[in-house]
């Protein structure tokens, strides 16, 4: 408890500005060189705590266009006979027909959920006829949409320009809002059209119908004195409110998971930039507390209270393995996903010795978005002994941490540091890991391509830590074959250039004049250029192979302080555009303005 009291005292002194600061130097937050651009837009025009804006005016969301029935020549068949579907049933049939041939349509859960929801949209007489998905034939529907997609690819330049102009007009009308007198870009002004839910991993609700969102489902948020957005003709909004403590412009509840969806500002907006900056500053502040927190939970492994022991072991997993705390679910929710606090005995196996290590814990469970988390990791002996204790006399379905809840853990984290959550730990460890990996992997003398490979390898370590997986892209094999073909062709060019250089060197040795010297230099430069191109292709192939099942983007955009990457780019003379796309650079404009080459997290 002494450490907890010290942490509370330190937090209070920090709020009062009484904690002595170390001298500003390389790698210390607060250094002027690492905090350049203090007059940035996201630091100006501050409101009191909780207030996000004074003025918010916008046009509301853009709704998906109404369904256009299929042409008469495109038919649906049941038991080999054409069946004329009602408009509602036909629309849902097109959702499945579009996906014909996709892996999803081979999954039993997807097929079952789709068919159940589709039958709900059918007329009574249609349900009496269509009783089995196996007897349905969507071939003509599928071919119709394949042909439409092919036709779009061969549009004339004029037709493509017209479509571009229409999209730009839509962007101008719905894609911007006025926030405190400034025009700000909106992130996702289009409401998602109806379709079939896919989910990530083996989601139990895959195939269910995502219903069409209507204006009557949508809550509008804007300032009281602004012009309220006009709903589409013949409709009205569910509600119009003025809540300046939130940053969303419109909200509705989607039909599959009953989760709330929002129209938000673009990530490059002032408010989003400020929120991101504060998020990473909170994680960065953890650096001053983390050693004491770790000492505390290690001491708590020996606590007399079972609740305290369980909390300490859970916090160790959150810290070391970047596990999510796990949100409590409503009774009856279909997806059996868990986090650290809701782990069951069946999700953990203990091995006294495995893989040449002692005290190994094997995790196997479905995490967020039904992504499987599997890991075998050696742990400290007291953690292993405590896990044995927690599992005594429990069945497979019993909670591992039966004295712990997400709520109680979060309350404890707040006591350790103001603003501390499991996600802050995750962000802190992800960012620290990236910084350490970049320091270990990057060599100043490497080529740009080799440095980028080092960066992606560092990013990959973080993605694995955070369990950011993806399925191998369906185009992977083909793209790798194309890349290997390019590499082979480049090798042949290098061999030919090397032979030409040898001949040029022999001619210069024989003639010794200026002309032969010029030819020799030209051949040498050509060989160097081709060798560099070959090296870049080889690095690209290695990078593609290593990351085929790892999603680098999730951690890069959400858990890694962008100032680390920008500082690395500046320090090693790597163009920032090699790491961040144009859209991402706009998103992290605040970091580009703040981070010098000596910034450290």
From Swiss-Prot:
Transit peptide range? 1-50
Instruction: Give the EC number.
Output: 5.6.2.1
Give the co-factor note. Divalent metal ions (calcium or magnesium).
Catalytic residue list? 559 (o-(3'-phospho-dna)-tyrosine intermediate)
Short name of any one Pfam family annotated for the protein: Topoisom_I
Site note Interaction with DNA applies to 152, 200, 248, 279, 337, 368, 410, 468, 486
Q: Which cofactor does it need?
A: Ca(2+); Mg(2+)
Q: Where in the cell?
A: Mitochondrion
**Keywords assigned:** DNA-binding, Isomerase, Mitochondrion, Topoisomerase, Transit peptide
Give the superkingdom in one word: Eukaryota
- Where do the segments described as Disordered lie? 22-48
Which Gene Ontology molecular function entries are recorded, alphabetically?
DNA binding; DNA topoisomerase type I (single strand cut, ATP-independent) activity
Domain Topo IB-type catalytic residue range list: 268-601
Q: Which InterPro entries match?
A: DNA_brk_join_enz, DNA_topo_DNA_db_N_dom1, DNA_topo_DNA_db_N_dom2, TopoI, TopoI_C_dom, TopoI_cat_a-hlx-sub_euk, TopoI_cat_a/b-sub_euk, TopoI_cat_euk
Query: What GO terms in the biological process aspect are recorded for it?
Result: DNA replication; DNA topological change
Tell me the segments the record calls region Interaction with DNA: 261-262, 324-329, 421-423
Instruction: Give the chief site where it resides.
Output: mitochondrion
EC top class, as a word: isomerase
Q: Which reaction does it catalyse?
A: ATP-independent breakage of single-stranded DNA, followed by passage and rejoining
Query: What Gene Ontology terms describe where this protein resides (cellular component)?
Result: chromosome; mitochondrial nucleoid; nucleus
**Function recorded in the entry:** Releases the supercoiling and torsional tension of DNA introduced during duplication of mitochondrial DNA by transiently cleaving and rejoining one strand of the DNA duplex. Introduces a single-strand break via transesterification at a target site in duplex DNA. The scissile phosphodiester is attacked by the catalytic tyrosine of the enzyme, resulting in the formation of a DNA-(3'-phosphotyrosyl)-enzyme intermediate and the expulsion of a 5'-OH DNA strand. The free DNA strand then rotates around the intact phosphodiester bond on the opposing strand, thus removing DNA supercoils.
Q: Please give the family membership noted in the entry.
A: Belongs to the type IB topoisomerase family.
- The identity of this protein, by name, is DNA topoisomerase I, mitochondrial
Q: What is the lineage of its organism?
A: Eukaryota, Metazoa, Chordata, Craniata, Vertebrata
């Amino acid at each position: 408890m002494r450490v907890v009291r010290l942490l509370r005292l330190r937090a209070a002194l920090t709020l009062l500005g009484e904690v002595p600061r170390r001298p500003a130097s390389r790698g210390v937050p607060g250094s002027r060189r690492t905090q350049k651009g203090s007059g940035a837009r996201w630091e100006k025009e501050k409101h009191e705590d909780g207030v996000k804006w004074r003025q918010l005016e916008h046009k509301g969301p853009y709704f998906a266009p109404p369904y256009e029935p299929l042409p008469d020549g495109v038919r649906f068949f049941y038991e080999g006979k054409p069946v004329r579907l009602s408009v509602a049933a036909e629309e849902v049939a097109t959702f499945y027909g579009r996906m014909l041939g996709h892996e999803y349509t081979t999954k039993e859960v997807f097929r079952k959920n789709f068919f159940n929801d589709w039958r709900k949209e059918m007329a009574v007489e249609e349900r009496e006829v269509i009783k089995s998905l196996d007897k349905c034939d969507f071939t003509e529907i599928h071919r119709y949409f394949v042909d439409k997609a092919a036709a779009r690819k061969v549009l004339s330049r004029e037709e493509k320009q017209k479509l571009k102009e229409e999209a730009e007009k839509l962007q101008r009308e719905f894609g911007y809002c006025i926030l405190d007198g400034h025009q700000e870009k909106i992130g996702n002004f289009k409401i998602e059209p109806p379709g079939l839910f896919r989910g990530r991993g083996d989601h139990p609700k895959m195939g269910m119908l995502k219903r069409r969102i209507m204006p009557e489902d949508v809550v509008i948020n804007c300032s009281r004195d602004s012009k309220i957005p006009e709903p589409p003709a013949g409709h009205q909004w569910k509600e119009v409110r003025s809540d300046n403590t939130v940053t969303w412009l419109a909200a509705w509840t989607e039909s599959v998971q009953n989760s709330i969806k929002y129209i938000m500002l673009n990530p490059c907006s002032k408010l989003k930039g400020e929120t991101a900056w504060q998020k990473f500053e909170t994680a960065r502040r953890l650096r001053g507390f983390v050693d004491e927190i770790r000492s505390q939970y290690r001491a708590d492994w020996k606590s007399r209270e079972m609740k305290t022991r369980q909390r300490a072991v859970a916090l160790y997993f959150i810290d070391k393995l970047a596990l999510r705390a796990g949100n409590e679910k409503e009774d009856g929710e279909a997806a059996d996903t868990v986090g650290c606090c809701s782990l069951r005995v069946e999700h953990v196996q203990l091995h006294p010795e495995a893989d040449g290590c002692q005290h190994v814990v094997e995790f196997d469970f479905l995490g967020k978005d039904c992504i499987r988390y599997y890991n075998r990791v050696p742990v400290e002996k007291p953690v292993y002994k405590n896990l044995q204790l927690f599992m005594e006399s429990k069945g497979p379905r019993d909670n591992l941490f039966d004295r712990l809840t997400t709520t109680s853990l979060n309350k404890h984290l707040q006591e350790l540091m103001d603003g501390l959550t499991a996600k802050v730990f995750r962000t802190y460890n992800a960012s620290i890991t990236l910084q350490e990996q970049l320091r270990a992997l990057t060599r100043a003398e490497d080529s740009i391509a080799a440095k980028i490979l080092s960066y992606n390898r560092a990013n990959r370590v973080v993605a694995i830590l955070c369990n950011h997986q993806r399925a191998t892209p369906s185009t992977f094999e083909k793209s790798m074959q194309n890349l290997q073909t390019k590499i082979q062709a480049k090798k042949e060019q290098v061999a030919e250039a090397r032979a030409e250089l040898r001949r040029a060197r022999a001619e210069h040795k024989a003639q010794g004049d200026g002309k032969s010297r010029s030819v020799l230099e030209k051949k040498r430069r050509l060989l160097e250029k081709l060798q560099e191109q070959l090296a870049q292709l080889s690095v690209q192939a290695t990078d593609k192979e290593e990351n085929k099942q790892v999603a680098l983007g999730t951690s890069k955009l959400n858990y890694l302080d962008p100032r680390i990457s920008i500082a690395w780019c500046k320090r090693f003379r790597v163009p920032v555009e090699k790491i961040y796309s144009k859209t991402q650079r706009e998103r992290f404009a605040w970091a580009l303005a703040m981070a010098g080459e000596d910034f450290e997290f």
